[in-house]
Amino acid sequence: MSAEYHNVELRMFDEAQFTCRTLGTGLTVGLRNSKVISVRRDNETVKEIHISSLSNIYRFSQKTVAVCTKKCVGDAVFTTYLLGFDSPGDVRGFLNSSDLLKPLCNENKKETRTSIFDRRTDSWSAVQYFQFYSYISQQQNMMQDYIRTSTYQKAILANASADFRGKVVLDVGAGSGILSFFAIQAGATRVYAVEASNMATHCNSLVQANKLAGRIVVISGKIEEITLPEPVDVIISEPMGYMLYNERMLESYVHARKFLAPHLRQPVKKKQNRRERERLDEDDQSPYVKQLSDSEHSDEVLTDELDCEDIDIEDQVHDGATKLSNKSLPCPGIMFPSVANLYIVPFSDEALFAEQYGKANFWYQQSFHGMDLTALRNAAVTEYFNQPIVDTFDIGICPALPCIHKVDFRTVSESELSSIDIPLNYQITTCSTIHGLAFWFDVGFLGSQRDVWLSTAPTEPLTHWYQVRCLLGTPLFVQEGQSLNGRVVMHANSRQSYDVQIELIVPGSETKIVNSLDLKNPHFRYNGYPPAPPPGSHVRSPTETYYANLCAQQQQQQQMEMQPQTMVNNGNPISLAAAAAAVVGGVGMPNNNSGQINYRNSPVYTMNQATGFLAATGSIPNIVQTIPLAVANDNLLQNQSHSMQLSPQPVNQSSLEFGRFITSNNSQIASSMLRSVNIPSATPVIEPLTNVSGSGIPTNESVYYNPVISSNFGDSCFTMNNVVNPSKNWNSGIHQE
């Protein structure tokens, strides 16, 4: 006797009368000799059901098994028994208790089969994955990524009236539910927030606390396994991992297209549709479309991959967005994000390469506490170079333009995401040594009103995705103008990640460098500091730049410490409160109606930063054309440490505007009211100026002039004369363009 199952109910179905009669409850069921199902009450046999190859056994429901038997081959009458077990586990155990029953169990896969997610994922990997995202601290880490969270909110709210207002939205992998809240802010009627980890409980708590229980419905489960009570109009998610594809969440995001209303599903190639239908099961089908595969109209079934004879998806893609040339085709459903670009570029980083080799050199020791480690040195090198490096870097280490791999989430199939082959072709712009390939991605939210992009590029503010670099096992020296070809092949694995193969080839030679990497095992190298530019990036003396910046900062500090009492307006003292209005209207009086400056006839005031003052009676268009480029906005020289200009440059007179101050990288000119401060300790000297550094000041105009404080470094002279950074009080009330 095999394992026994208790508390079983036995019924017999009468096919002639279409009735079901109960034979007993609280029974014990066991399989004897693999051919007889014995049903007993205590020690009394209630029924023995003989099974053979002529019998049919079905899992009738979650807890019920139907056993159909007949006496001989020619007998057309089946006797059907229904066994009601105490739990689904008892049903599985019973059906697997005999080799004779196992194939019968597998005939009906409706309840015993696994989902698409389970078939492609190791159970231990799924447990770790969902446990990781169930932690509040991890959700906080993502939510505090300002670039990520704010870009999603901007994309959703910027398309609120056209894409979200009055719509039903599906949030795939909702996590804390932050994207669902954004959809509600945009006017969505209802949001289904699907979350497979235990974070679903916390998400529901936030929904209840924010009094949105009727509008945000939290569903605990995998997107591949759940059903929805209605189709949706919009799908939102944050499915990107390191190097875009890690964690294989993109496949779940694409799978969610089956929940879109039928008229919103994007068509794909017919050949893909046929291939997918061969393996199509209930998990793949839309829960709103009746299965018609057994009828003569089976080709009319609407799945998330529709027949489309003349459409070539590759021809539709332009700048990351899909444009349908045939207006009769269904409009694509809104998916945020809609498209993604993966950027791949070679890089040169001798320090990183040496760092990885340095780690492996630990295993060169022949006497580590008396133990010889050298046998593992080669294995250590292989392991360290198989790790993708997650950090950030200066774009200057890349000697070529990146290659771009585009994906459209509205049309791509799940199978296309399981194997990715990306050809590479570069034209080298700088002689360098290539140590590997760098990866980052941008995703686009293509809305009806506005397109919004989220970038993880090294030239953009840092996100929690950073960038990823894959090292080559052997460096490759390339010259300017040389071509470099290769490919990146990514194969999905059951650990929710990818096995990455990179290959670089120098055309016309035998040189070929390859490496294999495990995206599941990255090395997190980011140390919290901004990346330094690569060696050799300075085009002028860093020492001179440093001391010029220091001098400018000191002079600005002296200016801020000054407490002037009066200003001079054509010889008449005025209060500081009236200073801002001194030039309005062209006669030294405020013009409250226009709110702007009539600078054509306005008197000009300039100030020496250190010890004196300079006053001129001319108008602004005739004022200084030569201004030092070391003056920035409110924070002097902020962000200018690498591009500081030490010598003056002429500027365009027509560019002079109030409220604009020049930086070394900005052609907008500092010209807000250059003014004079009467400092008691200063002794003004009145003399005509025929020309001040080519400023073009007329010779018949008098100015108050004091010597300029300057710092000389070789042939360069850094000066702060004639340019000031006005205080907030001075700028108040002045219109800025």
UniProtKB/Swiss-Prot annotation:
S-adenosyl-L-methionine binds at residues 148, 173, 195, 224. Residues 266-300 are annotated as: Disordered. SUPFAM superfamilies: S-adenosyl-L-methionine-dependent methyltransferases (SSF53335). The keyword Cytoplasm applies. GO terms for molecular function: histone H3R2 methyltransferase activity; histone methyltransferase activity; protein-arginine omega-N asymmetric methyltransferase activity; S-adenosyl-L-methionine binding. Its EC number is 2.1.1.319. The active site is at 238, 247. Residues 126-503 form the SAM-dependent MTase PRMT-type domain. Methylates (mono- and asymmetric dimethylation) the guanidino nitrogens of arginyl residues in proteins. May methylate histone H3 and activate transcription via chromatin remodeling. Involved in the development of the reproductive organs during worm maturation. This is Probable histone-arginine methyltransferase CARM1. It comes from Schistosoma mansoni.
